[in-house]
Amino acid sequence: MIDKEQAAPEMIEKVVTIRRVAKVVKGGRRFSFSALVVVGDGEGKVGTGKGKATEVPEAIRKAIENAKKNMLSVPLIDGRTIPHEILGIFGAGQVLLKPASEGTGVIAGGPVRAVLEAAGIKDILTKSLGSDNATNIVHATMEGLRSLKRVEDVARQRGKTIDEIMN
Protein backbone atom coordinates (compact mmCIF):
# COMPACT_ATOMS: atom_id res chain seq x y z
CA MET A 1 0.00 0.00 0.00
CA ILE A 2 1.31 3.47 -0.93
CA ASP A 3 1.42 6.13 1.77
CA LYS A 4 -0.54 9.33 0.93
CA GLU A 5 2.52 11.51 1.56
CA GLN A 6 4.61 9.51 -0.95
CA ALA A 7 1.88 9.45 -3.63
CA ALA A 8 1.25 13.21 -3.53
CA PRO A 9 3.64 15.51 -5.41
CA GLU A 10 5.89 17.74 -3.31
CA MET A 11 3.79 20.51 -1.79
CA ILE A 12 4.88 24.14 -1.49
CA GLU A 13 4.24 25.32 2.08
CA LYS A 14 4.44 29.00 2.99
CA VAL A 15 3.83 30.43 6.46
CA VAL A 16 2.02 33.76 6.05
CA THR A 17 1.65 34.83 9.69
CA ILE A 18 2.38 33.59 13.18
CA ARG A 19 0.65 35.37 16.04
CA ARG A 20 0.81 35.01 19.79
CA VAL A 21 -2.73 34.97 21.15
CA ALA A 22 -3.86 35.06 24.77
CA LYS A 23 -6.76 33.54 26.67
CA VAL A 24 -7.46 35.36 29.91
CA VAL A 25 -8.18 33.00 32.80
CA LYS A 26 -8.58 33.48 36.54
CA GLY A 27 -4.87 33.01 37.19
CA GLY A 28 -3.69 35.35 34.40
CA ARG A 29 -3.13 34.85 30.68
CA ARG A 30 -2.66 31.58 28.80
CA PHE A 31 -0.58 32.17 25.66
CA SER A 32 -0.76 30.12 22.50
CA PHE A 33 0.30 30.60 18.88
CA SER A 34 -1.87 30.94 15.79
CA ALA A 35 -0.40 30.24 12.33
CA LEU A 36 -1.78 31.00 8.86
CA VAL A 37 -0.28 28.78 6.15
CA VAL A 38 -0.68 28.48 2.37
CA VAL A 39 -0.11 25.10 0.70
CA GLY A 40 0.00 24.41 -3.04
CA ASP A 41 1.34 21.95 -5.59
CA GLY A 42 2.67 24.65 -7.94
CA GLU A 43 0.41 23.35 -10.71
CA GLY A 44 -2.93 25.02 -10.02
CA LYS A 45 -3.98 23.60 -6.66
CA VAL A 46 -3.82 25.79 -3.55
CA GLY A 47 -5.28 25.85 -0.04
CA THR A 48 -5.08 27.91 3.15
CA GLY A 49 -5.32 26.82 6.74
CA LYS A 50 -5.10 28.09 10.29
CA GLY A 51 -3.69 26.23 13.24
CA LYS A 52 -3.43 27.05 16.92
CA ALA A 53 -1.28 25.41 19.59
CA THR A 54 0.92 26.22 22.58
CA GLU A 55 4.06 25.74 20.47
CA VAL A 56 4.82 27.37 17.08
CA PRO A 57 5.84 24.18 15.17
CA GLU A 58 2.68 22.42 16.33
CA ALA A 59 0.52 25.38 15.21
CA ILE A 60 2.22 25.32 11.78
CA ARG A 61 1.71 21.55 11.48
CA LYS A 62 -2.01 21.91 12.29
CA ALA A 63 -2.34 24.79 9.80
CA ILE A 64 -0.69 22.72 7.02
CA GLU A 65 -3.04 19.81 7.76
CA ASN A 66 -6.02 22.19 7.62
CA ALA A 67 -4.78 23.78 4.36
CA LYS A 68 -4.47 20.38 2.65
CA LYS A 69 -8.15 19.75 3.47
CA ASN A 70 -9.20 23.09 1.94
CA MET A 71 -7.53 22.85 -1.47
CA LEU A 72 -9.07 24.38 -4.58
CA SER A 73 -8.19 24.04 -8.23
CA VAL A 74 -7.34 27.24 -10.14
CA PRO A 75 -8.00 27.39 -13.90
CA LEU A 76 -4.74 28.46 -15.55
CA ILE A 77 -4.03 29.59 -19.11
CA ASP A 78 -0.89 27.91 -20.51
CA GLY A 79 -0.07 26.92 -16.91
CA ARG A 80 1.12 30.46 -16.11
CA THR A 81 -1.70 33.05 -15.68
CA ILE A 82 -5.41 33.40 -14.87
CA PRO A 83 -8.16 33.51 -17.54
CA HIS A 84 -9.66 36.92 -16.67
CA GLU A 85 -9.63 39.87 -14.27
CA ILE A 86 -11.40 39.33 -10.92
CA LEU A 87 -11.91 41.12 -7.61
CA GLY A 88 -11.79 38.89 -4.54
CA ILE A 89 -13.49 40.24 -1.42
CA PHE A 90 -13.36 38.93 2.14
CA GLY A 91 -14.35 41.21 5.00
CA ALA A 92 -12.75 44.61 4.39
CA GLY A 93 -9.94 43.04 2.35
CA GLN A 94 -10.12 43.28 -1.43
CA VAL A 95 -7.66 41.88 -3.94
CA LEU A 96 -7.72 42.72 -7.66
CA LEU A 97 -6.20 39.96 -9.80
CA LYS A 98 -5.35 40.64 -13.47
CA PRO A 99 -3.89 38.25 -16.05
CA ALA A 100 -0.48 39.28 -17.39
CA SER A 101 1.57 38.60 -20.51
CA GLU A 102 4.39 36.07 -20.49
CA GLY A 103 7.53 37.21 -18.68
CA THR A 104 5.73 39.69 -16.39
CA GLY A 105 6.23 37.64 -13.24
CA VAL A 106 4.22 37.77 -10.03
CA ILE A 107 3.54 41.42 -9.18
CA ALA A 108 2.04 41.04 -5.70
CA GLY A 109 2.53 41.93 -2.05
CA GLY A 110 3.34 39.52 0.80
CA PRO A 111 0.21 37.47 1.60
CA VAL A 112 -1.11 37.58 -2.00
CA ARG A 113 2.29 36.51 -3.39
CA ALA A 114 2.39 33.50 -1.04
CA VAL A 115 -0.97 32.25 -2.34
CA LEU A 116 -0.14 32.84 -6.03
CA GLU A 117 3.32 31.22 -5.87
CA ALA A 118 1.92 28.18 -4.06
CA ALA A 119 -0.74 27.89 -6.78
CA GLY A 120 1.96 27.95 -9.47
CA ILE A 121 0.82 31.17 -11.15
CA LYS A 122 3.84 32.68 -12.91
CA ASP A 123 2.49 35.86 -14.58
CA ILE A 124 -0.07 38.05 -12.81
CA LEU A 125 -0.72 41.64 -11.75
CA THR A 126 -2.41 42.27 -8.39
CA LYS A 127 -3.50 45.17 -6.25
CA SER A 128 -4.47 44.83 -2.61
CA LEU A 129 -7.28 47.23 -1.67
CA GLY A 130 -8.99 48.00 1.64
CA SER A 131 -7.79 46.17 4.74
CA ASP A 132 -4.15 45.11 4.98
CA ASN A 133 -4.92 42.37 7.50
CA ALA A 134 -3.00 39.31 6.25
CA THR A 135 -5.81 36.87 7.08
CA ASN A 136 -8.44 38.88 5.18
CA ILE A 137 -6.09 39.43 2.22
CA VAL A 138 -5.29 35.70 1.95
CA HIS A 139 -9.01 34.82 2.12
CA ALA A 140 -9.87 37.55 -0.44
CA THR A 141 -7.21 36.16 -2.81
CA MET A 142 -8.61 32.64 -2.39
CA GLU A 143 -12.15 33.97 -3.00
CA GLY A 144 -10.95 35.62 -6.22
CA LEU A 145 -9.24 32.42 -7.41
CA ARG A 146 -12.35 30.39 -6.49
CA SER A 147 -14.51 32.72 -8.65
CA LEU A 148 -12.40 32.25 -11.82
CA LYS A 149 -14.11 30.55 -14.75
CA ARG A 150 -12.65 29.00 -17.90
CA VAL A 151 -13.97 30.14 -21.30
CA GLU A 152 -15.13 26.57 -22.04
CA ASP A 153 -17.27 26.51 -18.87
CA VAL A 154 -18.89 29.90 -19.61
CA ALA A 155 -19.62 28.83 -23.21
CA ARG A 156 -21.21 25.58 -22.01
CA GLN A 157 -23.36 27.41 -19.42
CA ARG A 158 -24.63 29.90 -22.00
CA GLY A 159 -25.08 27.31 -24.73
CA LYS A 160 -22.72 29.15 -27.09
CA THR A 161 -19.44 28.39 -28.83
CA ILE A 162 -16.09 29.63 -27.52
CA ASP A 163 -15.76 31.96 -30.55
CA GLU A 164 -19.10 33.62 -29.69
CA ILE A 165 -17.93 34.24 -26.12
CA MET A 166 -14.52 35.62 -27.13
CA ASN A 167 -15.91 38.06 -29.76
UniProtKB/Swiss-Prot annotation:
Gene3D superfamilies: 3.30.160.20, 3.30.230.10. GO terms for molecular function: rRNA binding; structural constituent of ribosome. GO terms for biological process: translation. Keywords: Ribonucleoprotein, Ribosomal protein, RNA-binding, rRNA-binding. The keyword RNA-binding applies. Part of the 30S ribosomal subunit. Contacts proteins S4 and S8. It comes from the Bacteria. One of its GO terms (cellular component) is small ribosomal subunit. With S4 and S12 plays an important role in translational accuracy. Transmembrane segments: none annotated. Belongs to the universal ribosomal protein uS5 family. The N-terminal domain interacts with the head of the 30S subunit; the C-terminal domain interacts with the body and contacts protein S4. The interaction surface between S4 and S5 is involved in control of translational fidelity. Signal peptide: none annotated. This is Small ribosomal subunit protein uS5. The keyword ATP-binding does not apply. Residues 11-74 form the S5 DRBM domain. HAMAP family: Ribosomal_uS5_B.
